């Protein structure tokens, strides 16, 4: 990934992000904002405005311009969303956040239906994994109704409170921006989620069955291309 950004890693001769665009379009999401940083031009030059993929794409660069050069500068996943919203309110309805380097076949329509049925402001999609694998992931702890209570980041197997893991797929309502400060680094997992739990906001885990391959993990990538 020194020369190729993760969303551009090829699977069956297509960048992984192209599969995500197809999934989004299939479920009626055609307005897409891509938060770019590392090798941003590789992504923008390939996908452009999204027209040939049946969607509309806009880009937000996570960093600054110095002497005409784009300098990547992480402001966190939530910080990136907030900057987009502060610049021009893009998120005016229920929206979905995906990682650009995961291959999934999630039923997004059903996920959004369940999110709304819960009356959630924020939902995260969880997936059950074999108990001996929990130490590779962030574990989600909920009450019987699915309301998120806490997280364990890569716990030891015997200390894990559950076998439900955070897949990095989120559904939000625009009200979530009330919990994200402007102009400072802020991460969805490390900062926003604990804040939502502390505030008692309607924040739920939605367990779903689907294929999920993390292209950022080398064994998962080999599994995908086979």
Can you say where each PLM-predicted feature lies in the sequence?
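Conserved beta-strand termini and adjacent loop/short-helix elements that scaffold enzyme active sites
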Residues: 60-62, 125, 206-208
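A short, conserved acidic/glycine-rich loop-to-beta-strand motif
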Residues: 118-128
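Short, well-ordered turn and helix-capping elements at secondary-structure junctions
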Residues: 47, 63-64, 126-128, 152-156
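Catalytic-core segments of class I nucleotidyltransferases/pyrophosphorylases
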Residues: 92-96, 103, 109-116, 129-134, ...
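Extracellular disulfide-bonded cysteine-rich modules/repeats
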Residues: 138-140
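Conserved N-terminal catalytic core of the sugar/cofactor nucleotidyltransferase
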Residues: 2, 9-99, 108-110, 142
């Amino acid at each position: 990934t020194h020369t190729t950004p993760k969303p551009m890693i090829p699977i069956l001769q297509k960048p992984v992000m192209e599969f995500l665009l197809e999934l989004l379009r299939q479920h009626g999401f055609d307005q897409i904002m891509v938060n770019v940083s590392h090798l941003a031009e590789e992504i923008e030059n390939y996908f452009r405005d999204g027209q040939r993929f049946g969607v509309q794409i806009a880009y937000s660069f996570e960093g600054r311009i110095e002497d005409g050069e784009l300098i990547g500068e992480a402001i966190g996943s939530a910080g990136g969303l907030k900057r987009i919203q502060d610049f021009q309110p893009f998120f005016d309805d229920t929206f979905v956040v995906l990682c650009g380097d995961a291959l999934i076949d999630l039923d997004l329509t059903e996920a959004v239906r369940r999110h709304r049925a819960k009356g959630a402001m924020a939902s995260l999609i969880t997936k059950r994994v074999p108990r001996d694998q929990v130490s590779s992931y962030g574990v989600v702890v909920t009450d019987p109704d699915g309301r998120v209570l806490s997280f364990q980041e890569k716990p030891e197997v015997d200390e894990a409170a559950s076998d439900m893991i955070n897949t990095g797929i989120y559904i939000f309502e625009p009200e979530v921006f009330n919990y994200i400060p402007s102009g400072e680094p802020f991460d969805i997992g490390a900062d926003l989620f604990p804040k939502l739990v502390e505030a008692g906001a309607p924040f739920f885990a939605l367990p779903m069955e689907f294929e999920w391959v993390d292209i950022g993990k080398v064994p998962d990538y080999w599994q995908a291309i086979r």
